[in-house]
Structures are given as C-alpha cells and as structure tokens.
Amino acid sequence: LKDYRCREGSINNDGIILGISGLVVNKNKSYSNMKGIGFKEELLEFDKDECILNKKNNIDRYILKGNDYNKNVSIVINTDSGKYFNKMLDVSESKNIEINLLMNTSFLRDNITDNYNHSNILYKGSSLSDLNNFSSLLHNEFFCVKTNDYEIINDCKNKKLNSIKMNNEIKKDLLINTKKLLNNGAIIFIRENEFNLSELSSTINYIKSRGYNIVNINELLS
C-alpha cells in the first residue's frame, strides 16, 4: 500500500464533481510502530487526505457526479407509477448489481417495506414538511435530488444532507441514451416505465462491456 494525495474534483456554476481522497503516511505513528523492529510495510499507518471538494464540506452545493478517476457509474430509477420498479430491481439483482431508487414520501410510505435496501433510496420532494416526513420514515442518511425548479438544497442542507442535481433523465430509448451519457462517475437517472424495463438488461450488459463498474450511490459518491 503506497500513499497518494487527494485527486481534486472540479466546480462550476451548476455544482461540483467530487474528488477522490488520498492516503498519506503518518510518520510519527509509523515510526512508533516500528521502533526497535526495523521497517515493515505492514506496520505503516495512514491518514486520509481529504479533498476540498468532498461531501461533508459542500452541503450547500449540488453534486453533479462522482469522481472522474474511477470507472464507476450509478443507476437511479426515478419512481413514478410503482408498476415497474420491482421488476427493474429483479433485473439488477439477476445481474448481481445494485441500483438506486428515487422517490417522494408517499411512494416510500406506500411501496417500500423493510425488505428493501434502504441505503439505496434517494429523496425527491418540494417542501420541508415532506422532507421531514420522509426522514422520519426512512431513518437512514440519504441524498436529496433536484428534479425540477424547486431548490431542494435549501431544505436538505439544514439537515446536513447532500443534494444531487439531475441534469438528464432517460424516459425511453435507454440503451441509446445511456451510450451518450456514459463516463466516469456518471449518475444515470432513468424513469420507471415499461420502455426502460424492456431495455434495462441489455443496457447493464453494455455498461459492463465498456469496462464500467455499476455501484450504488453511496459508493459512487464516497
């Protein structure tokens, strides 16, 4: 294990692209571990080298995507009718990947049980009271997502929650449109509908064939 510095992200008027934190040797602790023994690599101790553009220090800015350095992407289903999301989850499970669900409070209350992976759930809404209700139901820490003109970040930053800006949502022609959006750190938002369900399996296969890892949103934005 070698040390390496933070690889910083970037910032523009729309928001931030996260960097990737590094590891640096803690010389004092490492020396103390090896005193009287001599150098042993396994006794090195490291400290995290945090980037400026990290989640913790940027709750007042929208996150646009994950870092540009790892070949990771994340798929988020923007729930709608509730008719198709379970079948879409079944497809992802058959491919041994995790995908995420974006929903409001009423959808969470009516459709999500304890059997679901709550850590892969994201929030959309248009009022502070809705956010409070969502939080009381889910309990987990989660990401907020701006899906329209409502500045959801104003509600979420007061609860120390990070916000993501959804710049593109794929409503149909999933495979073709995924090819256009695919890059390191991409968050691929797809509408919950029959069109995207029918192309989800082939789209996952394509993403993997291009050498990308499909990870959950927490890993992508870690």
Where are these regions (language model features)?
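Terminal accessory/targeting
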Residues: 1-75, 83-86, 90-99, 183-222
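Metal-dependent polysaccharide deacetylase catalytic core of the NodB/CE4 family, i.e.
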Residues: 71-73, 81-174, 178, 182-188, ...
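N-terminal beta1-alpha1 ligand-phosphate binding loop
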Residues: 78
